[in-house]
């Protein structure tokens, strides 16, 4: 199990086990092979990109799907951040959430050590749950 797996496994534990989990990823085949993503609880966004023309990625489909979810576990990516931000599960002012179990779990720190000089205090909204993500895994671009 790698560090990245630990982040997602711990984040999953913050959601009720009787709730479905929609897995959205640009490496969906890898996700389907993970032991910790097995069972009827997990639904995979498996739109075949080949159906949409040249086989190129069509992330807007995954973004739309994420906005329909009632919470989420996000990666340190702008796509997953916007997918969580645009959900209607919680109000944007940080008051009580509309859905009983609505929450977003976000990795903290967002970037690896290379980017420590940047002020990231406003990146993750106060109503989201920050979960430690070992920065040694986060690869610099």
Annotate each language-model stretch with its function:
Residues 1-53, 57:
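Core catalytic architecture of nucleotide-activated donor-dependent transferases building glycoconjugates
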Residues 31-38, 86, 113-118:
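Short loop/helix-cap segments at secondary-structure boundaries that form the rim of catalytic
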Residues 38-41, 100, 124-128:
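A short helix-to-beta-strand connector/capping loop
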Residues 46-48, 108, 132-135:
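Residues at the C-termini of beta-strands that transition into short coil/loop
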Residues 48-68, 122-126:
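Repeat-unit-sized solenoid/scaffold elements
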Residues 59-116:
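A donor-sugar binding/catalytic signature common to diverse glycosyltransferases
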Residues 113-141:
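Leloir-type glycosyltransferase catalytic cores
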């Amino acid at each position: 199990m790698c560090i990245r797996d630990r982040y997602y496994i711990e984040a999953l534990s913050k959601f009720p086990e009787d709730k479905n989990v929609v897995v959205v990823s640009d490496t969906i085949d890898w996700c389907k092979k993970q032991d910790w993503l097995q069972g009827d609880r997990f639904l995979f966004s498996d739109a075949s990109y080949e159906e949409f023309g040249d086989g190129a990625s069509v992330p807007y489909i995954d973004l739309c799907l994420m906005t329909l979810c009632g919470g989420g576990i996000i990666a340190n990516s702008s796509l997953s951040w916007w997918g969580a931000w645009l959900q209607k599960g919680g109000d944007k002012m940080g008051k009580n959430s509309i859905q009983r179990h609505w929450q977003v779990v976000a990795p903290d720190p967002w970037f690896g050590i290379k980017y420590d000089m940047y002020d990231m205090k406003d990146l993750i909204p106060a109503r989201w749950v920050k979960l430690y993500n070992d920065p040694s895994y986060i690869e610099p671009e």
